[in-house]
Amino acid sequence: MPSALPAPTLITVHPNEVRAIRYKLKQTQADFAVMIGVSVATLQSWEDGRRRPDGPAEALLRIADKNPKTVLKILGRA
């Protein structure tokens, strides 16, 4: 019988990390929101800790944190 896959590790992006990633990319809230495809209100709620990014948004933020220049280039902002 095949072994079960381990449960995925829940990794969440802290509100301070969202803001730090945006600063690293040198983007305003408005520009960053457009760049990642969310509303400014959503981005503000992430940065204020009222909500947390999940799914693709969280993955994009993690990638942007590790490779900001690549993300800017891919998203046409470099």
Regions found by a protein language model. Give the residues of each.
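N-terminal flexible/basic segments that precede or flank functional cores
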Residues: M1-V13, K69-A78
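Short, basic-rich loop-to-helix N-cap that marks the start of a DNA-contacting helix
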Residues: R50-R62
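Basic, Lys/Arg-enriched C-terminal extension of HTH/homeodomain DNA-binding domains
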Residues: I63-K69
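N-terminal positioning helix adjacent to the helix-turn-helix/winged-helix DNA-binding module
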Residues: H14-E17, P56
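Conserved hydrophobic/aromatic packing and binding residues within compact polymer-binding modules
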Residues: F32-A33, L43-W46
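Residue-level detection of the helix-turn-helix DNA-binding "recognition helix"
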Residues: Y23, G37, D48
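Short basic helix-loop element that most often maps to the first helix and adjoining turn
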Residues: V18-D31
